[in-house]
Amino acid sequence: MENKDSLQFHMNMGKLISSVHNMITRRFVQNAHEAGLDISLDQWMVLGPIHYHGDASQKLLSDFCFKDKTSITRIVNTLEKKNLVVRVPDQLDHRVNRVILTTAGKQLFNDVLPIMNKTKKEVSRDIAESDIEIFKDVLTKIISNLENE
């Protein structure tokens, strides 16, 4: 019986988390496209830490975005092809590339901010801020539980 309950818990929780992620992603892309912007949520999530830090190593991006190095490389390659970022060698460690926003990347970041805020408002409509904080705390604890194994 315990195995059945565990499976049911995993399927319900995993399905809910996956569904929420997919729906938020679709809404963000829809809002961005309606505004005439060509950017995915993954690309936006990579632009954020680069903008915040001024530049970022691909390792930092991987850690920040909870994505493997291969996924980050693919996203950065796409952003580079769109002329939104450039890679430059780190001044102290030439084995490391720093990713920097171009002028077009900075402009896109600023153009997307209102879209992200709109999406955030749509996602959290009629949900108390305290409930959002509890939800984030629970998800953070789940992440911590799984990272510490």
Language-model segments: residues:
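C-terminal regulatory/oligomerization modules of transcriptional regulators
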Residues: 1-6, 129-149
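Alpha-helical linker/hinge and terminal dimerization helices associated
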Residues: 20, 24-27, 31, 65, ...
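Charged, amphipathic alpha-helical coiled-coil/dimerization segments
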Residues: 77-137
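N-terminal leader segment of winged-helix/HTH proteins
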Residues: 1-35
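N-terminal helix-turn-helix DNA-binding core of bacterial DNA-binding proteins
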Residues: 22, 26-70
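Residue-level marker of regulatory loop/turn positions in helix-turn-helix DNA-binding domains and
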Residues: 9, 39, 116
